[in-house]
């Protein structure tokens, strides 16, 4: 599939909009009214610290909405203002945040339904308005919407587009794309659609498994069974792992992505030698700045001698999950919640989601005496939600 030709056709159709409809000033004003918080602004100005009574709060120095998310949410809202009466669809949630998506639902912006991972575009009529979310859409979806003559509003984060360009470069030069990500995540599904031959690896353990195979250790049938849902059609590890390039889902843990990239470079050096490395490995730089900043800030926050840590963000948010992993790896009691309503002031309890688990209720969430609470939030979490959480902590400790 000539993905570049399809993109060019879509983007030059006259029914494609990547810039939005309002000025930056209008956009900032609209977002500020919905999602900004005076409390959070004052905490930022006070070196990200807040104290009241026995409660001390320390915010991460980088948290919450990133530029790409702000842009996507603002464009979605202004699309409804620009098209007040038209049917408006999204190919998926605009971002992984329940409050934002519920707000859009109340504005009658609908998500295209899916069953068993297959989207049903039959409800989308010719000329309808369709929003592509921050983590993008597959090239096949773009082509289908183009053929339906839909008005396409593309809010894809530029960092995600950069990954697409990377895997297209791999394809052009007949390199297989090794994608560090979750093979079912919406962003990785989109990236896969732009790649040629690809293999998705979730973590360093899977990278080591692939490396061992490249070096001649492993069983082909076992390999294909392990990666059956995470590789391109017709993938042959004996052929398609001779020339590889690395890319990533932008919300993965930065340190792990870097480690996987270096690991595969070392693997190809060992197999083919320094003189031939450029024929067998392509270096990469697709780590998102915002993801990197939030993870670095989290690594600093966990050194603040905290009693507990609250991580705020959608439960299906990959970047938020990785912030939670950092807390756990530093042995800090942490609680991942998506909305402030998970905290009960009356009962001093929190309903939170541990990694790889269902929601559980923690009673006596805030102990007696002085307490220092660290707080961070994922890139899809508005300041207002963080402020609501802080207000509940204040109420519990009064």
Swiss-Prot record:
Binding locations of dimethylallyl diphosphate: 96, 185, 317-319, 380
Any one of the GO BP annotations: isopentenyl diphosphate biosynthetic process, methylerythritol 4-phosphate pathway
S-S bonds: none
Residue positions binding (2E)-4-hydroxy-3-methylbut-2-enyl diphosphate: 96, 185, 250, 317-319, 380
Active site: 187 (proton donor)
This enzyme's EC code(s): 1.17.7.4
Gene Ontology MF terms: 4 iron, 4 sulfur cluster binding; 4-hydroxy-3-methylbut-2-enyl diphosphate reductase activity; metal ion binding
Keyword terms: 4Fe-4S, Iron, Iron-sulfur, Isoprene biosynthesis, Metal-binding, Oxidoreductase
Binding annotation for isopentenyl diphosphate: 96, 185, 317-319, 380
Binding sites annotated in the UniProt record for [4Fe-4S] cluster: 66, 157, 288
CDD domains per UniProt: lytB_ispH (cd13944)
Cofactor binding summary note: Binds 1 [4Fe-4S] cluster per subunit.
Catalytic activity: isopentenyl diphosphate + 2 oxidized [2Fe-2S]-[ferredoxin] + H2O = (2E)-4-hydroxy-3-methylbut-2-enyl diphosphate + 2 reduced [2Fe-2S]-[ferredoxin] + 2 H(+); dimethylallyl diphosphate + 2 oxidized [2Fe-2S]-[ferredoxin] + H2O = (2E)-4-hydroxy-3-methylbut-2-enyl diphosphate + 2 reduced [2Fe-2S]-[ferredoxin] + 2 H(+)
Protein family membership: Belongs to the IspH family.
Role played: Catalyzes the conversion of 1-hydroxy-2-methyl-2-(E)-butenyl 4-diphosphate (HMBPP) into a mixture of isopentenyl diphosphate (IPP) and dimethylallyl diphosphate (DMAPP). Acts in the terminal step of the DOXP/MEP pathway for isoprenoid precursor biosynthesis.
Protein name, per record: 4-hydroxy-3-methylbut-2-enyl diphosphate reductase
Organism annotation: Prochlorococcus marinus (strain MIT 9515)
Organism lineage string: Bacteria, Bacillati, Cyanobacteriota, Cyanophyceae, Synechococcales
């Amino acid at each position: 599939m000539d993905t570049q030709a399809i993109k060019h056709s879509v983007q030059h159709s006259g029914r494609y909009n990547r810039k939005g409809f309002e000025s930056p000033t209008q956009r900032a004003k609209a977002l500020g009214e919905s999602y900004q918080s005076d409390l959070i602004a004052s905490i930022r100005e006070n070196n990200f610290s807040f104290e009241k009574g026995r409660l001390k709060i320390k915010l991460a120095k980088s948290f919450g909405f990133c530029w790409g998310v702000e842009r996507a949410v603002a464009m979605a809202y202004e699309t409804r203002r620009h098209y007040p009466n038209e049917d408006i669809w999204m190919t998926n949630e605009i971002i992984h945040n329940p409050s934002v998506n519920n707000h859009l639902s109340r504005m009658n912006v609908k998500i295209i339904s899916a069953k068993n991972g297959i989207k049903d575009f039959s409800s989308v009529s010719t000329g309808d308005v369709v929003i592509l979310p921050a983590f993008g859409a597959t090239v096949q979806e773009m082509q289908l919407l183009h053929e339906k003559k839909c008005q396409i509003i593309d809010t894809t984060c530029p960092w995600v587009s950069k990954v697409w360009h990377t895997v297209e470069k791999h394809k052009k030069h007949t390199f297989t794309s090794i994608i560090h990500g979750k093979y079912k995540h919406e962003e990785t599904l989109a990236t896969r659609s732009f790649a040629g031959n690809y293999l998705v690896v979730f973590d360093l353990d899977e990278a080591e498994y692939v490396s061992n195979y490249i070096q001649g250790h492993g069983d082909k049938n076992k390999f294909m069974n392990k990666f059956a849902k995470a590789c391109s059609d017709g993938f042959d590890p004996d052929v398609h792992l001779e020339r590889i390039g690395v890319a990533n889902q932008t919300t993965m843990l930065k340190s792990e992505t870097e480690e996987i990239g270096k690991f595969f470079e070392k693997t190809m050096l060992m197999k083919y030698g320094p003189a031939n490395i450029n024929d067998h490995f392509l270096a990469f730089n697709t780590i998102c700045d915002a993801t990197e900043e939030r993870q670095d800030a989290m690594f600093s926050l966990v050194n603040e001698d905290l009693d507990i840590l609250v991580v705020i963000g959608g439960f299906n948010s990959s970047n938020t999950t990785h912030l939670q992993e950092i807390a756990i790896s530093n042995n800090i009691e942490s609680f991942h919640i998506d909305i402030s309503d998970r905290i009960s002031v009356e009962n001093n309890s929190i309903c939170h989601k541990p990694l790889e688990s269902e929601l559980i209720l923690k009673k006596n969430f805030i102990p007696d005496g002085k307490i220092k609470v660290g707080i961070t939030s994922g890139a899809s979490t508005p300041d207002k939600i963080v402020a609501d959480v802080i207000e509940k902590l204040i109420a519990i400790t009064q």
